[in-house]
Amino acid sequence: MTIHPQNHDLPTGSAMKATPFEALDLVFHFEDQAQRQWWKQAGPVLGQHLLLANYDINKQYQYLCFFGHHIIPILGPGPGSGYDYHPLEISQNFQRSGSTIRLGFQPRAYSSCVSPQDPFGELSTEEAMARLGQVTGVELDLQPYHLLASHLNLTKKEEKEMLQPTCYNSLSPSFKTQGLLAVELPRTGSITLKGYWFLSAKSMVTKTPISELSFQAFRNIDHGKDLLVPALRPIEEYFAEMKMKPANPTTPQTTEFATVACDHVDMSRTRFKLYLYECLWKYDRLADIYTLGGRLKNAPGIAEGLELLREIWSILQIPEGYHFASLQNSLLRKSTNAESCGEASKPASEEREFFDDQALIFNFEIRPGEKWPQPKVYFPLAYLTDSKAADAVVALFEKLGWKEEARRYKDNLKTYYPRCDLDKTSGLQHVLSFSYRPKTGPYTTVYYWKIGA
């Protein structure tokens, strides 16, 4: 079935006043209603991001066409179709040299969402990359993907074990997917892809900590060349002291690895990334992880980054204490003794406790041939109303001297979510990330959820 636009006239006046989305909406058609719904709900938001970020008009058309013809067909059922996760995310990276728009998404063919053909999304991810790699204007090198996939993807035997009803039905969404993709939409040059592996299922079925799975995969890729190992070594040393455990949906740890990612470009330019979640929101804890217990104190840019992180901590009015998944609160209420809850038992401390499904996120970026890993911190924003979160982002931009971005940010946000009262909503601005490199200075990203809300 082909779905055609219905009565979408150009704005009053000259046709030249139509935005790229409005012009394309007159001629695009889609194979089913789900695809049409993705276009109508997410297309205008992407169009506004590109427009308000002052992308070249040709790039605006290119990226909207790319989204409509190549991303939407691999998103699966339309938005609001019973997802217990957010299958599409728009993010905007800000730095001194300007801003860049990026899309993050989970490739899910419709059949894989309603049948057991591809329960962990591995086939959908590979099919999506094969499709996107054929697009003119996309740079794609699958060597990094295949090297990591050979170590991190579930084997057929592991998949079968995870699909046992008593196991699979109790898993959270993070345990039921193996991969996500992201595409960067640069102002010049080619579109590039990045792939993510969520390793909770692999860890659970192999009874191996995610940290160990990740470190071993990176060492196997390095294959004795010492391109990745020097930067990996301080990470291994720091987390070896914590005695990391295999992932468990009912007994999460306070500090827990979750994800591995890499760019799907030539190996010499690929950034390999390790992501972890931290439940204790304290600045001293943040600083300890950011510096790997002091191992990075002499690395370029670390001191400057820490200074700005302290400013961000204050600007965001971080609610300090332990932040747990709501599942843990349920376990604690049902438990009659600490042992039956395992790691879900309350920590023996006087810190405040929140059961709000939020965590600080860190990633450590490893580039071939570089001595030091590059840390980045991700701050959840859902504890703030979107209006207050926007005020915090504006305050950060002003602190960084980005006056024009600060002036425009809140008005732009209202344009992305025209039907929302930002004083009453939360989580539309889902996460704010920050890193610092001496050559490029501060680098921050805002991640937007509930696209088209």
From Swiss-Prot:
Output the superkingdom of the source species: Eukaryota
Summarize where dimethylallyl diphosphate binds, as residue positions.
Answer: R102, K194, Y196, K273, Y275, Y378, Y443, Y447
Main EC class the enzyme belongs to: transferase
* EC numbers on record: 2.5.1.107
Give GO terms for biological process: alkaloid metabolic process
The protein's annotated pathway: Mycotoxin biosynthesis
Listed under catalytic activity are: verruculogen + dimethylallyl diphosphate = fumitremorgin A + diphosphate
**What does the protein in this record do?**
Verruculogen prenyltransferase; part of the gene cluster that mediates the biosynthesis of fumitremorgins, indole alkaloids that carry not only intriguing chemical structures, but also interesting biological and pharmacological activities. The biosynthesis of fumitremorgin-type alkaloids begins by condensation of the two amino acids L-tryptophan and L-proline to brevianamide F, catalyzed by the non-ribosomal peptide synthetase ftmPS/ftmA.
* Protein name per UniProt: Verruculogen prenyltransferase
Report the source organism.
Neosartorya fischeri (strain ATCC 1020 / DSM 3700 / CBS 544.65 / FGSC A1164 / JCM 1740 / NRRL 181 / WB 181) (Aspergillus fischerianus)
